Amino acid sequence: MTAALMLAAAAPALGQPPIEQDLAALAKSAEAQLHQSFANLAFEDFALSPVHGPLFQASAGGRILYYAPESDHLLFATIYDKNGFNLTALSQDAAARAKLKHLDPKEALLVGPPDAPLVIEFTDPDCPYCRALDRFWAAKAAEGKAVRRQIYFVSGIHPEAASKAEHILCAKDREAAFRATYAGEPSKPLNRCADGAARVEAHAKAVKSMGISGTPTLILDGQLISGFSQAEIEAWLARQRPQAKPPT
């Protein structure tokens, strides 16, 4: 504190005010550090951000958000460290793992071999990307890379999602009904039953507790994946079944 006061007192009376001089020096130092820490990126400009003060982290709807109370800014952002690690994704995964206690596997629709790698899947029968994901899983199963899907239906986005989810959960052969529905060919009339309706409601509560707001959403070994991100899913599958080393 004493050193700072002495520096301020020694600042020249003419030219930039001391605070502006301090900010200019800080900006120059910060820009140099940016180029040093992230040397593989080309930056076109550099300026002071409108965000002031400490930055706090919160989660909402399955996403990590950042809040700066001093300037009252809310940031929808992804934070990386200098080694390229996605710190936002790590926080998101940790939040998802902490909420897994809200899921009851007995309420889920289980699809796939019991001994296969487990996928926790939040899906909507009328979501086109969910249907594409179902085709992807079918293709992987045909390649001998089947997974065990622990499925919860998200019924608050499309108007017919709840009735189609109930139809699947009321069927004698739920997996067959699931396949047909996701192929766009559910049998008519749609099945109705008290147990199916109760399960749809249980799924809705689980979805709310998990903070899921979009479909498909997957949890793979504690890693949260929003959307049908094929590259991330393929990478996870590769870790489940490492390729055999060629004979030497």
Locate each region found by the language model.
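Bacterial N-terminal signal peptides
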Residues: M1-A9
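C-terminal cap of thioredoxin/glutaredoxin-like
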Residues: I19-L23, A27, E31-Q36, E44-L48, ...
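Short, surface-exposed acidic
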Residues: N40-F46, A177-A180
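Envelope-exposed proteins and targeting segments
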Residues: P54, G61-R63, D115-L118, K145
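A short, surface-exposed interaction/processing loop segment used at functional sites
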Residues: H73-H102
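A short beta-strand-turn-helix
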Residues: K99-P117, T248
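Structural alpha/beta surface segment adjacent to cysteine/selenocysteine redox centers
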Residues: A116-D195, K208-S213, A235-Q240, P246-P247
